[in-house]
Amino acid sequence: MVHLYYWLAASLAVSASNLRFIDRNHPQLIPPPSNDPFYAVPGNIDTFSPGDIIKHREPPSRISAYGWTPTHLQKAYQILYRTTDSQESPTAAVLTALIPRDADYNKVISLQMAEDSATIDCGPSYTMLASAQENPLLMSNITQLQLLFAEVVLARKWIVIVPDYEGPKGSFAANKMTGHAILDGIRATLRSNHITGIEPNPKMGLLGYSGGAAATQVAVTMHEGYAPELEIAGAAMGGLSSLGNASDIFSINKGPSAGLIPSALLGLASQHPELQKSIDESLKPEFREYFYSPLHQCLQASSVMFYYQDVLGMFHNESIPGLKAELEKAWDKETQHKAARIKAPLYVYQSVVDHLSSIEAIDALVHGYCDRGFNVHYERANSPNLGHVKYGLVGVSGAVSWLQDRLDGKAAGVGCSNHTDTTSTLDPDIAALYPRNISDALYAIVNAP
């Protein structure tokens, strides 16, 4: 995921470079969330209920994807709201509400963007800003790529909310923090009419791909147990991970995505002190500063730093079994939320040649959902040229079309349905939403061998 996203985003950045004329002057640098008082969890956080709005503001910098502000975006708001961390303690998170021109205030999509980072400074509320793109450690081409997904939704006049679901500690891989923040973000959205104009009971859908799909999956799994009052019309998630156990993350060691290992361990450890202690005690002293670098940079920088690195080799050999045991303990605590049922209809879209996931494992996941009586449409793409990133670009069209029916009030069929997706090209209607330089780059990447 990391290296392909990076390659795609870098290609887009080059192709879209002459779009910088939109803002010839460098945007004024603003402090990242770790130094911005707006993001601070207030001392009286326990006086707020989950989903309560604490404060709001307009973004302090222009929202930008490769130098281009989404055409259908009219205004935006950042909202700090109360949520709950993995230890069941009150905390706060930020969401960004993107309001399109001529908005339908009765239709909202919660877009979970892949973050895959272990610091609050990589939350999309910050990395979608032009100012963040001036910081080489905190710039996120992955966020900019996913803003292209947001434009697909905004073009339908739906409102998009984007939660910083990793919370104030950058708790990547901490499922409970993630699910709470997404669901409480929806609660906050329903209470935001005086800020956003969103109606109190809109049709609500969820959308996420890759790391954003994992977050969406957690949210729908926790929905019934944590926020049963919420009505979710449907959830679309694609490019799901097939990792079953926490220690499976080490299977990508010495590979192009090895940077996910320190980010995931540090993100999870932010919610689990015993895991943090094990990491501290297991690291070789000469690698300590190197390993902890993801606490100060986003996925893009970490992916370059750890590209094909032996991350496991940074730990004392005799300490690795104990480290893995603590990792599994923390993960088990994070996954104790398995729901009796998933209430919302699901749209799962997956490429059979996704190099990050075993298609057999995703097939088994979907079949398990069906056996438990969940409502699932499974879109299984069999084109041999659609890897993980390519199908993210190609598959979003079908996902949003499915969400259109759900938000329009059309019932999703009872039970499960499967469809083989033979599409292998970018939807021209989606490509037309972007400036020529960006759409040309997307076509070139999707059509590449």
Regions inferred by a protein language model and the residue ranges of each:
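Fungal secretory targeting signals
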Residues: 1-20, 449
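Catalytic-loop region of hydrolases
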Residues: 11-104
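Accessory cap/linker subdomain of secreted extracellular hydrolases
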Residues: 30, 238-339
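Short, surface-exposed "cap/lid" segments of acyl-processing enzymes
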Residues: 85-155, 164-166
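Alpha/beta-hydrolase active-site loop
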Residues: 143-148, 155, 172-195, 214
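Primarily recognizes the serine-hydrolase "nucleophile elbow" in alpha/beta-hydrolase
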Residues: 187-260
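C-terminal catalytic histidine-bearing segment of alpha/beta-hydrolase fold enzymes
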Residues: 323, 328-331, 363-449
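Short beta-strand/loop motif that positions the catalytic acidic residue
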Residues: 342, 347-354
